[in-house]
């Protein structure tokens, strides 16, 4: 009789029983004859191993440090999701006991320090290590907590050296310490093709070798161990038969989920191969992306069955009759480790989308990648003898950096990389559509995932690991609204793309919509200004509530509408008024009363109409998380006012650091009450007085117009106090 148990733990210098590293189909007979009570206990979300207790104590210690650190705001999403449940009255917590002191054995154990989590300069103290924990029986009835899970797809592990693979295993073990368990899908395909590789001796041997290699590496760092799962997947002939937002491809389904849940419950990392069994119990190769989607549907409690074109919750099909939604793991992250890195962007100097709001950007990015793929295909046809590296920069990286690594083969990697990026984008988008809005995706290179937060020696400089940073902050390493430096330009570089952080996100509404009419233009007879309170596309009461909440002051709506009437450039709304911006066209005081020439309304670059950011607001509940600020800012500076905008903020405003990082320049206005910011280039440019009928002024610089406008804006607040916005 075979029973799924923990794999041996060697990473912490602690001995456990040496058990099998692989699953076994004979266990199916046990599951089928088990009673409902046994199955319910088997699938329960209550961790019973001592290793899980130690990980829980570590997490409790970490959350205490975060709550007391200056970086608490950045980590509040992590604290909200992963903070351990408060103990019931009369129940003693293990954390205070663990806080009493660190034993000499644990302090000197190199395995404990190598798996510590470096929180970086943002969190103090920067490193925590393990502390002694009393080995007492775990009381299941008092320790219920949800199990958080990340699903990881590792592409081409055969091309990774042992050091990189070990770094990935270390990172996954650190994520487990932080409360996020992992399951891994291996993708050993050397190239993208419509035809799947056949299950022959050589291919299966390679799969097993890489799986055994990774499982052994995981066991070195993850105390509960790792387990190779071989018999959990089945394949049907159904393909794209169900019209739904959740697309089914290839008919891959989880048939034996009892092989997955017990290891995950015990903190063991399951490693799944892209192999399934058809109705004749014959092994068939399947796409790793389809395996990822099948696992996501399983963990989300969705089974794909064609029944009059609808999805039904199927429990019997996967042996989970007693596994309710409360007992399933919470799938928080979809992680793709690909040598190509993040999703490329032709519009960013660093070459990649660092944050993708799928709700608003998916279609545009998909079209961009399809164009890149078509261009790469045309180039390959016209220049068949030319090296890939001389063409598309993505293909150049694949040829020079990936194909030359151990086990690689150049002819295997001849397909254009944009198609692989498109598949990565597609699988994450499909996954996040069926997961809660709090779930997210991350696409990065295996090398970045293996980055050590704690260096091997004192001479090395600590560096942030993108996976750990994202887990703690729910943000990308680099803000997507930051301007990119020309020095980091991707074109001409063979480096892989920076990581891409993806969220299901929120819709973005722009009135008027520049995607239909182009960038915003000054008002004219043919292009009148919109009226905020009267435009049917705008819910002004909600907009007013957003401003009041964000500024913590009540807006004098009537006075404000009177002030901006006839000069509204546009409005941006993120989600259900979670964030937004109101932009206006302002005229310098020195030009008021002067007849505005007709050509001034045809361009945003005139002395009569200065593009001005009048209000930038984000709900307090959405500040510091979710990327709402970045979403609104990107729409403002890249779509609404791509040629530049000016605004002001009170000098004491703590948000000014955020503004400064995103502006081209900043200057304190006379009186030290206001600070002026702008994103325009060439603010010293002078408009010709004769060309623009400036009269006595003869000429005017952008700088002079900006200062004039920012000095002349009068706040509109109901409290009547003429203090700064």
Swiss-Prot record:
Pfam families the record matches: NAT
Residue ranges occupied by any N-acetyltransferase domain in the UniProt entry: 527-702
Top enzyme category: transferase
Predominant localisation class: mitochondrion
Region (Disordered): 38-119, 451-479, 502-531
Pathway linked to the protein: Amino-acid biosynthesis; L-arginine biosynthesis; N(2)-acetyl-L-ornithine from L-glutamate: step 1/4
Family: Belongs to the acetyltransferase family.
Protein name in UniProt: Amino-acid acetyltransferase, mitochondrial
């Amino acid at each position: 009789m075979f029973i799924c148990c923990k794999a041996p733990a060697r990473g912490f210098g602690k001995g456990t029983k040496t058990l099998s590293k692989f699953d076994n189909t004979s266990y199916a007979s046990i599951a089928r004859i088990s009673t409902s009570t046994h199955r319910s206990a088997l699938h329960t979300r209550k961790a019973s191993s001592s290793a899980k207790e130690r990980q829980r104590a570590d997490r409790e210690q970490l959350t205490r440090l975060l709550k007391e650190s200056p970086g608490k705001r950045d980590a509040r999403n992590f604290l909200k999701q992963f903070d351990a449940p408060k103990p019931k009255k009369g129940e003693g917590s293990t954390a205070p006991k663990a806080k009493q002191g660190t034993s000499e054995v644990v302090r000197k154990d190199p395995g404990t320090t190598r798996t510590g989590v470096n929180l970086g300069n943002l969190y103090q103290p920067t490193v925590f290590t393990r502390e002694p924990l009393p080995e007492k029986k775990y009381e299941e009835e008092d320790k219920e907590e949800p199990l958080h899970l990340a699903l990881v797809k590792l592409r081409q592990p055969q091309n990774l050296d042992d050091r990189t693979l070990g770094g990935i295993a270390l990172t996954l073990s650190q994520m487990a310490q932080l409360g996020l368990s992992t399951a891994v899908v291996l993708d050993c395909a050397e190239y993208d093709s419509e035809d799947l590789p056949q299950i022959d001796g050589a291919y299966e041997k390679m799969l097993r070798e890489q799986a055994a290699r990774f499982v052994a590496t995981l066991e070195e760092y993850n105390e509960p161990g790792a387990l190779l799962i071989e018999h959990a997947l089945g394949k049907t002939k159904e393909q794209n038969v169900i019209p739904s937002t959740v697309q089914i491809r290839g008919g891959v389904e989880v048939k034996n989920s009892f092989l997955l849940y017990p290891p995950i419950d015990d903190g063991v990392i399951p490693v799944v191969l892209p192999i399934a069994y058809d109705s004749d119990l014959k092994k068939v190769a399947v796409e790793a992306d389809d395996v990822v989607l099948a696992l996501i549907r399983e963990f989300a409690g969705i089974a794909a069955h064609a029944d009059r074109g609808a999805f039904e919750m199927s429990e019997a099909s996967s042996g989970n009759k007693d596994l309710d939604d409360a007992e399933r793991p919470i799938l928080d992250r979809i992680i793709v480790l690909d040598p190509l890195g993040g999703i490329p962007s032709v519009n960013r100097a660093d070459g990649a989308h660092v944050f993708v709001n799928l709700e608003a950007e998916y279609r545009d990015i998909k079209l961009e990648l399809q164009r890149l793929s078509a261009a790469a295909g045309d180039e390959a046809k016209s220049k068949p003898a030319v090296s890939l590296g001389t063409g598309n920069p993505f293909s150049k990286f694949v040829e020079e950096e990936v194909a030359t690594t151990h086990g690689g083969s150049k002819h295997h990697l001849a397909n254009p990389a944009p198609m692989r990026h498109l598949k990565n984008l597609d699988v994450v988008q499909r996954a996040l559509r069926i997961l809660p809005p709090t779930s997210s995706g991350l696409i990065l290179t295996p090398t970045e995932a293996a980055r050590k937060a704690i260096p091997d020696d004192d001479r090395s400089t600590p560096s942030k690991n993108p996976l750990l940073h994202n887990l703690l902050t729910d943000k990308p390493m680099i803000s997507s609204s930051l301007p990119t430096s020309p020095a980091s330009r991707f074109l001409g570089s063979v480096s892989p793309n920076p990581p891409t952080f993806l969220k299901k996100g929120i819709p973005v509404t722009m009135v008027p919509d520049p995607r239909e009419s182009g960038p915003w233009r000054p008002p004219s007879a043919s292009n009148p200004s919109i009226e905020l309170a009267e435009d049917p596309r705008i819910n002004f009461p909600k907009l007013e509530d957003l401003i009041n909440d964000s500024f913590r002051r009540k807006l004098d709506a009537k006075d404000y509408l009177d002030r901006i009437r006839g000069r509204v450039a546009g409005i941006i709304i993120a989600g259900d008024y979670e964030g937004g911006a109101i932009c206006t066209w302002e005229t310098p005081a020195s030009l008021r009363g002067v007849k505005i020439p007709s050509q001034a309304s045809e361009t945003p670059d005139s002395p009569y109409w200065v593009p001005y950011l009048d209000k930038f607001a984000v709900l307090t509940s959405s500040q510091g998380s979710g990327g709402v600020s970045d979403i609104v800012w990107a729409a403002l500076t890249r779509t609404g006012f791509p040629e530049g905008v000016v605004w002001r903020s009170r000098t004491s405003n703590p948000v000014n650091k955020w503004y400064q990082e995103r502006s081209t320049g900043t200057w304190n206005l006379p009186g030290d009450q206001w600070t002026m910011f702008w994103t325009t280039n060439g603010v010293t440019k002078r408009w010709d007085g004769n060309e623009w009928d400036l009269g006595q002024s003869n000429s005017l610089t952008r700088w002079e117009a900006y200062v004039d406008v920012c000095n002349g804006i009068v706040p509109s607040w109901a409290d009547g106090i003429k203090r700064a916005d």
